[in-house]
UniProtKB/Swiss-Prot annotation:
Taxonomic lineage from the root: Bacteria, Pseudomonadati, Thermodesulfobacteriota, Desulfobacteria, Desulfobacterales
Protein name, UniProt field: Transcriptional repressor NrdR
Keyword tags: ATP-binding, DNA-binding, Metal-binding, Nucleotide-binding, Repressor, Transcription, Transcription regulation, Zinc, Zinc-finger
Cofactor note: Binds 1 zinc ion.
GO biological process per UniProt: negative regulation of DNA-templated transcription
Gene: nrdR
Length: 165
């Protein structure tokens, strides 16, 4: 494997373990020329799942495309790379486990939004604004209105008592 920093092939595996999804082996490697470390993943090559776009085009399911969109939505939020990877792993696992050869881009987007909704409201709204193609502030307001009732329910005390007696 070529070192992504210096391009040399001379490296060794420092650590090897199953990824959280258990569908890949995560390897930490050290380049013996520049001494820098990098991570690689080894996984079984699957038959491709095709994503049917809104305009009818088909393209192969692309984990990196989903990862990129989620990373943008989670920028400057208190969300770890591991949490982002878990979301992507969950999306990928759900579609692979379904054993479908094709899946609509709408189903993919909705699944990502569902998982982001549970993780972080701001990341969810950011992702939704791109995915649902918000045109103006009114679109944001409508989405935020749907979040307010949920937030109120989450903030209520478990015993149902209020502070005023």
């Amino acid at each position: 494997m070529k070192c992504p920093y210096c391009g040399q092939l001379n490296n060794r595996v420092v650590d090897s373990r199953l990824s959280r999804s258990e569908f890949a082996v995560r390897r930490r490697r050290e380049c013996l020329d520049c001494m820098r470390r990098f991570t690689t993943y080894e996984k079984v090559e699957d038959l491709p799942v095709m994503v049917v776009k809104k305009d009818g085009r088909r393209e192969e399911f692309n984990r990196d495309k989903i990862l990129s969109g989620i990373k943008k939505a989670c920028e400057k939020r208190a969300i770890s790379v591991d949490q982002i990877e878990e979301v992507v792993d969950s999306v990928e696992r759900d579609f692979r486990d379904a054993n479908e050869k094709e899946i609509s881009s709408t189903v993919v987007g909705n699944k990502v939004m569902e998982l982001l909704h549970r993780l972080d409201d701001v990341a969810y709204v950011r992702f939704a604004s791109v995915y649902r193609e918000f045109k103006d502030v009114d679109d944001f307001i409508e989405e935020l209105k749907s979040l307010i009732p949920r937030k109120i329910l989450e903030d209520k005390k478990p015993d149902g008592c209020s502070d005023d007696g």
